[in-house]
């Protein structure tokens, strides 16, 4: 599997959409479960998982085929989870500061 993964990564690096689709098919479910475990929300996990693959495609020129693809998508998705939690905390803090009118 490792050789196939490396071959797919080389092809993705060269903008091969079929290879990207194959990586997506091979890794999406595992990544989705990984993200659901972190965020405890399947809709949010789906958004983060899709954004992760979008970022892989956008930065495909920087791919290193010798490295584990799952490690890459796990790192990207973890960073996206952290971003979500940070933004949620800020949003919550601002919502708490809004005075309630009419009560």
Whereabouts are the PLM-identified features?
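Internal acidic/polar
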Residues: 2-5, 91-103
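A short, charge-rich alpha-helical start-of-domain segment used by transcription regulators
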Residues: 10-31
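Sigma70-family region 2
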Residues: 13-14, 53-68, 88
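Residue-level preference for short helical/loop micro-motifs built around acidic side chains
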Residues: 21, 33, 43-47, 67, ...
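Amphipathic, Lys/Arg- and hydrophobic-enriched alpha-helical face
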Residues: 24-42, 59
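Arg/Lys-rich amphipathic alpha helix in sigma70-family domain 2
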Residues: 61-65, 78-95
């Amino acid at each position: 599997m490792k050789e196939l993964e490396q071959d797919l990564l080389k092809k993705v690096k060269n903008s091969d959409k079929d290879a990207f689709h194959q990586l997506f098919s091979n890794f999406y479910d595992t990544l989705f479960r990984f993200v659901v475990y972190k965020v405890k929300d399947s809709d949010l996990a789906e958004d983060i998982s899709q954004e992760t693959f979008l970022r892989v495609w956008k930065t495909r020129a920087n791919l290193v085929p010798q490295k584990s693809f799952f490690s890459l998508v796990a790192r990207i998705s973890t960073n996206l989870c952290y971003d979500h939690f940070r933004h949620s905390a800020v949003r919550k803090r601002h919502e708490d500061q809004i005075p309630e009118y009419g009560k």
